[in-house]
């Protein structure tokens, strides 16, 4: 082997790396903040580009010293840096959530450890004013060895952290050769078991910094706010001569470029820093996510300028309530991985910008860097755009939980889980190192309000030490660590340095229980509302709970984006996206990585639109339509609604806009307060009337444009006849001279309605199997009673019960049917059941079909459920219409899909679409495209019209795909249209929830009543 086995040595985490420091970008002169264009610094040389590359399936296959000066690399391939080697055909992708992809045997990894040899040549010119050279790697997975010009430089690990080497003595004037050996696995792999695709390579920027001999090396900026202004304390360490500190001038400028404070460093008595400066700013403008005001700080020395930014803000807890700038904080957050379907975990600034801008557009104010440090400019952008950040260390050892145990009781699992790593003293140095790499590099970012020690590692001495160091080093921020929740009985644990209790996916009852105990620490939902596929469905309920308790400081939805690998375009034009199991890997977790609010290409899921409106900046708490008094509450943390938004209101009648107006708020409504404003509207006597109040941005921000809608409220208005008038029209019977003729046999009732309509009713199923109008058959398959839906990702647990109950194989069975004519109408009475193979009857149904002389069919069903069975996915009627029924009109909640617990993205109205537009194309096919609270549905074909309406509202789906097709296929590009327009008319569907990883579906959204009735009318023309 050509390298020492540092990769299996817990005592060698780094070799020859520089001490941890804050991130900054030096230059020879004032070149601006260098956030968006750091490569413009004249002291930075970016080494990204195409590098020579050779892949080896095993480190034992690498026999030649490829790093030696003059080594011939003509047999090497080329690969882009930054980049992931799996994306270029080397090795293969693997997605696993909890389980390690290797045996659980720390610190050892498989002997056949894949590796990649990188070689890159670059030019270097010495600078007498900046003779020192530092080589920076911002992200390499999993570990790497470095050589320059054939001479060994050093070794490092921790994939998502910066490794810096002093390479001054290794460089020469002119052409230099950099060689890097990257290994797929190392002992650090056991601490990098995050829920993501396992990707390898140099995936972040590589660059050289030129610096003077004597220089500011590290600094820590903290701010405090007093009655007379703000105090800025800057502690620092210097390299080189002792006069470097006194020769460094500090200048602070405001956003407008005016100098507001100056100072110099003086020696201080501090455990971590040798120098300190204290500067005062009078009448400071504070930083917060809604008004992210940043000052600029310049460190000026003879041969170097460092420019950074300061956000003045103060964080503290009073009891169990978090205050930021003396305001009770509520985190409206989301978890974010570095992920792109083409570039994988190698994401650049533009990709990060797109994510953060979308977050701001959808009313997020916080992001958790799950579960590792991001690129340094991620945090700088959060400073600038206005997002709170929970900065998380690169530490997850969740796979230790899955070790094989005879005793699989949870208490024993936790005890053994903790012993492996979290409570193993051998891992204290590695855990401390990862914590410090996170904290030290980003310590100057005002957006960071909380340090997280990691994710799902269990708890023990490693984290006790890390938390203790963090609180001592940075008492200005809060700490959290969710896995402290997992306690074993082998010892007493120290939780004193955890400020915020973190929990994942708690049920509402658990939150209530925590709050009832009058906790002394805030509760944070570090992960909640699992957004996998069609979901989440419980956002509004969590929002209400977060508002109910001051001690519940908010939460972070899991997660931002679907993780998938783009594989090109299918013949049908759809994108091909691979997830776990699509790459030939044996150990994988399927599509559990497809759990975001946006698709891999950042197209929003309906769940993201749902989130945006639930977390709108204001809400109407009450509206008195008699007086026009409207109580408006400000849900922002800092801004006054008067300065932030204006209102657009509209009154719609049966989906048609009746009046529109605009209101400028002329009175102050401070954050967290409410005020009554006047909004009188005229309301017609008849029709379903809604008042929609939209909240529009008043002025441009750096991210958002004026007039953008930030959300809306919808209020049902009362009038004399509040029914939808089109529905009344559809429900009304048309007077005709048609007479009924019925042909009866053991199997069928064949009903002729006048000369044009013929219906065949199957007496064995109790349902129609043929509807003919003017000789044209409208049904392509018999009608069905339908209780199945293609399981959503959030049905992944309950679907096992559903399939065990054979819901997916259920069908209608009639026991008796009779046909009578009464009052000019034909009545078909039936007693039937919904049954399935191997199990008892699921449902008993009493049905009455009423056919009127105009050919309309009305059905009334009384349903009784056997309580032995689980909740139903849905209940309704499924029809297969000719595919020329392509034009859809409906009145209900749209245009986004809607369900009983996922309906805030849309509003009541009249909508038009074609059938394909009604389909939400989730990459793993599942139930989608439902619309709830509907008054009527109309489908128009080339010659005929089919409509449905009810005295009570109903739910429906219209799709080119069957639920069987959606159930069977693993990818959306595999879906085949069935050749019909599939129409599901539902009493209701079961709720969506977030039970793929979260709590069970709330009771109020379950279709589990013992008895219910369903009534709907179908109009055929």
Can you describe what each PLM-predicted range is?
Residues 172-175, 235-316, 689-727:
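Extended acidic/polar, glycine-enriched regions
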Residues 3-15, 33, 37-38, 52-56, ...:
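Accessory beta-strand-rich segments of carbohydrate-active enzymes
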Residues 87-89, 184, 288, 680-687, ...:
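Beta-strand/loop-rich accessory regions of lumenal/periplasmic or secreted enzymes
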Residues 194-216, 572-631, 635-656, 682-727, ...:
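Catalytic cores of secreted or luminal carbohydrate-active enzymes
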Residues 87, 92, 99-108, 157, ...:
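An acidic-aromatic loop/edge-strand motif
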Residues 265-282, 655-686:
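Intrinsically disordered, low-complexity Pro/Gly/Ser/Thr-rich segments with frequent PxxP/GP/PP motifs
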Residues 148, 230-266, 629-634, 638-662, ...:
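Beta-strand-rich binding/interaction modules
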Residues 1-39, 96, 151, 190, ...:
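Extended substrate-binding grooves/exosites of carbohydrate-active enzymes
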């Amino acid at each position: 082997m050509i390298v020492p086995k540092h990769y299996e040595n817990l005592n060698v985490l780094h070799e020859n790396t520089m001490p941890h420091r804050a991130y900054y970008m030096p230059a020879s002169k004032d070149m601006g903040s260098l956030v968006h264009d750091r490569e413009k610094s004249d002291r930075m040389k970016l080494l990204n580009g195409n590098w020579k590359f050779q892949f080896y399936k095993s480190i034992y296959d690498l026999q030649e010293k490829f790093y030696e000066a003059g080594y011939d690399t003509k047999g090497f391939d080329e690969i882009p840096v930054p980049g992931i080697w799996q994306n270029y055909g080397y090795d293969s992708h693997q997605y696993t959530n909890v389980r390690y992809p290797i045996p659980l045997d720390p610190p050892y990894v498989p002997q056949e450890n894949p590796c990649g040899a990188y070689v890159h040549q670059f030019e270097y010119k010495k600078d007498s004013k900046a003779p020192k050279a530092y080589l920076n790697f911002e992200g390499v997975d999993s570990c790497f060895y470095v050589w320059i010009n054939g001479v060994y430089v050093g070794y490092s690990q921790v994939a998502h952290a910066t490794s810096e080497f002093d390479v001054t003595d290794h460089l020469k004037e002119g052409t230099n050769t950099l060689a890097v050996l990257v290994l797929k696995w190392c002992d650090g792999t056991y601490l990098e078991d995050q829920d993501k695709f396992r990707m390898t390579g140099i995936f972040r920027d590589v660059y050289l910094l030129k610096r003077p001999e004597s220089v500011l090396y590290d600094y820590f900026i903290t701010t405090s706010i007093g009655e007379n202004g703000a105090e800025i304390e800057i502690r620092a360490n210097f390299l080189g001569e002792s006069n470097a500190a006194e020769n460094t001038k500090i200048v602070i400028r405001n956003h407008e470029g005016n100098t507001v404070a100056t100072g110099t460093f003086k020696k201080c008595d501090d455990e971590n820093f040798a120098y300190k400066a204290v500067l005062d700013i009078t009448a400071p403008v504070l930083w917060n996510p809604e008004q992210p005001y940043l000052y600029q700080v310049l460190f000026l020395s003879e041969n170097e300028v460092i420019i950074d930014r300061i956000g003045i803000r103060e964080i503290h807890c009073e009891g169990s309530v978090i205050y930021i700038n003396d305001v009770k904080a509520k985190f409206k957050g989301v978890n974010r991985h570095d992920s792109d379907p083409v570039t994988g975990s190698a994401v650049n600034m533009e990709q990060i910008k797109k994510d953060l801008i979308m977050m701001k557009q959808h009313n997020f104010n916080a992001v958790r860097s799950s579960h590792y440090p991001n690129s340094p400019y991620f945090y700088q952008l959060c400073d600038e755009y206005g997002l709170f950040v929970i900065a998380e260390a690169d530490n997850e050892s969740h796979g230790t939980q899955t070790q094989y145990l005879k005793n699989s009781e949870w208490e024993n699992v936790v005890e053994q889980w903790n012993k492996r790593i979290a409570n193993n003293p051998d891992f204290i140095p590695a855990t401390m190192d990862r914590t410090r790499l996170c904290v030290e590099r980003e310590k100057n970012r005002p957006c960071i309000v909380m340090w997280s020690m990691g994710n799902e590692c269990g708890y023990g001495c490693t984290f006790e030490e890390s938390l203790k160091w963090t609180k001592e080093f940075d008492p200005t921020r809060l700490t959290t660590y969710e896995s402290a929740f997992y306690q074993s009985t082998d010892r007493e644990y120290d939780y004193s340095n955890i400020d915020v209790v973190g929990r994942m996916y708690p049920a509402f009852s658990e939150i209530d229980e925590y709050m009832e105990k009058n906790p002394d620490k805030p509760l944070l939902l570090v992960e909640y509302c699992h957004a996998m596929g069609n979901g989440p469905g419980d956002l509004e309920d969590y929002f209400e709970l977060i508002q109910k308790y001051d001690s519940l400081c908010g939460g972070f939805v899991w997660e931002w984006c679907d993780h998938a690998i783009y594989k090109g375009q299918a013949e049908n034009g759809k994108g091909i996206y691979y997830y776990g199991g699509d790459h030939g890997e044996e150990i994988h977790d399927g599509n559990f990585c497809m759990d975001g609010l946006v698709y891999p290409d950042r197209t929003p899921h309906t769940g993201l639109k749902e989130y945006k409106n639930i977390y709108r900046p204001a809400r109407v708490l009450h509206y008195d339509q008699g007086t026009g008094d409207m109580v408006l509450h400000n849900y922002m943390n800092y801004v006054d609604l008067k300065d932030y938004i204006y209102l657009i209101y509209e009154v719609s009648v049966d989906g048609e806009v009746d009046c529109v107006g605009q209101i400028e708020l002329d009175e102050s409504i401070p954050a967290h307060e409410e005020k009554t404003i006047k909004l009188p509207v005229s309301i017609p006597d008849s029709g379903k009337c809604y008042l929609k109040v939209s909240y529009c941005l008043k002025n441009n921000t750096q991210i958002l444009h004026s007039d953008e809608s930030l959300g809306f409220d919808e209020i049902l208005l009362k009038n004399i006849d509040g029914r939808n008038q089109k529905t009344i029209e559809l429900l009304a019977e048309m007077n005709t001279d048609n007479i009924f003729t019925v042909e009866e046999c053991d199997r069928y009732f064949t009903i002729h309605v006048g000369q044009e309509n013929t219906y065949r009713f199957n007496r064995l199923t109790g349902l129609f199997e043929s509807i003919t109008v003017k000789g044209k058959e409208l049904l392509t398959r018999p009608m069905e009673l339908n209780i199945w839906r293609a399981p959503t990702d959030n049905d992944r647990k309950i679907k096992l019960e559903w399939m065990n109950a054979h819901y997916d194989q259920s069908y209608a069975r009639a026991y008796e049917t009779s046909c009578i004519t009464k009052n000019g109408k034909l009545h078909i009475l039936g007693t039937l059941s919904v049954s399935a193979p191997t199990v008892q009857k699921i449902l008993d149904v009493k049905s009455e079909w009423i056919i009127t002389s105009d050919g309309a069919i009305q059905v009334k069903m009384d349903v009784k459920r056997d309580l032995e069975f689980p909740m139903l996915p849905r209940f309704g009627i499924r029809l297969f219409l000719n595919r020329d029924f392509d034009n859809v009109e409906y009145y209900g909640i749209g245009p986004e899909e809607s369900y009983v617990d996922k309906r805030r993205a849309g509003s009541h109205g009249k909508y038009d679409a074609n059938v394909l537009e009604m389909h939400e194309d989730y990459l793993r096919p599942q139930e989608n495209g439902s619309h709830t609270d509907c008054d009527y549905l109309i489908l128009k074909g080339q010659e005929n019209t089919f409509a449905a309406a009810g005295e009570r509202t109903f739910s429906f789906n219209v799709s080119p795909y069957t639920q069987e097709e959606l159930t069977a296929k693993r990818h959306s590009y595999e879906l085949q249209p069935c050749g019909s327009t599939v129409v599901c008319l539902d009493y209701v569907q079961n709720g969506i929830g977030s039970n793929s990883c979260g709590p069970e579906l709330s009771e109020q959204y379950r279709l589990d009543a013992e008895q219910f009735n369903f009534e709907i009318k179908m109009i055929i023309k």
